[in-house]
C-alpha cells in the first residue's frame, strides 16, 4: 500500500446569478407590478489537488531535460522550471517525453504529454503512470 502526501488543495468558487421576475396582480385590476431581484450563491466549480512528486523523480526528470536540451551542467533546472523558459519548442518537448518514457519504462498518452509544461508536471505524471503499472 502506498501513501501519497499532497502539497496543496485549492477550491475555486464562482458566483451564479439568476434574475427572477415575480408578478403580482390584485383581483379586478388590469395592471401588474413587476419585481426583479438577483439571487447569488457560490457554487464550487473546480477542486484541484496537487501532489508533489518525489525529489528523486524530479531530479531524474531534470537530468533528462538537461540532456535532451543540451544544457550546460551549471544550468539550474528545478521542479518549477518551464520547458519553454529553457528554449524548448514542441519538437524538443516530444524528445523530452520520449527520453522520460525510455528512462522510466512508461508510455504517456499524447493528450497528457501535451499538457506537460514543467519539470514538476512531468514528474507527477511519471509517478502516476508508474503507480498505475503496479
From Swiss-Prot:
GO terms for cellular component: chloroplast. 4'-phosphopantetheine is transferred from CoA to a specific serine of apo-ACP by acpS. This modification is essential for activity because fatty acids are bound in thioester linkage to the sulfhydryl of the prosthetic group. Residues 1-51 form a transit peptide. The modification O-(pantetheine 4'-phosphoryl)serine is found at residue 90. InterPro entries: ACP, ACP-like_sf, ACP_chloroplastic, PKS_PP-bd, PP-bd_ACP, Ppantetheine_attach_site. It comes from the Eukaryota. It is found in: Plastid, Chloroplast. One of its GO terms (molecular function) is acyl carrier activity. Disulfide bonds: none annotated. Residues 55-130 form the Carrier domain. Gene3D superfamilies: ACP-like. Seed. Belongs to the acyl carrier protein (ACP) family. In rape seeds ACP is coded by two multigene families. There are probably a total of 35 genes. This is Acyl carrier protein, chloroplastic. The gene is ACL1.A2.
Amino acid at each position: 500500500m502506498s501513501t501519497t502526501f499532497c502539497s496543496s488543495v485549492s477550491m475555486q468558487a464562482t458566483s451564479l446569478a439568476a434574475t427572477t421576475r415575480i408578478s403580482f396582480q390584485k383581483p379586478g385590476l388590469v395592471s401588474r407590478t413587476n419585481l426583479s431581484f438577483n439571487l447569488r450563491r457560490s457554487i464550487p466549480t473546480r477542486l484541484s489537488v496537487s501532489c508533489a512528486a518525489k525529489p528523486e523523480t524530479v531530479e531524474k526528470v531534470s537530468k533528462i531535460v538537461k540532456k535532451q536540451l543540451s544544457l550546460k551542467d551549471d544550468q539550474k533546472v528545478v521542479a518549477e522550471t518551464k520547458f519553454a523558459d529553457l528554449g524548448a519548442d514542441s519538437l524538443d518537448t516530444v524528445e523530452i517525453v520520449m527520453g522520460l518514457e525510455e528512462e522510466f519504462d512508461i508510455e504517456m498518452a499524447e493528450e497528457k504529454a501535451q499538457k506537460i509544461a514543467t519539470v514538476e508536471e512531468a514528474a507527477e505524471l511519471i509517478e502516476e503512470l508508474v503507480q498505475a503499472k503496479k
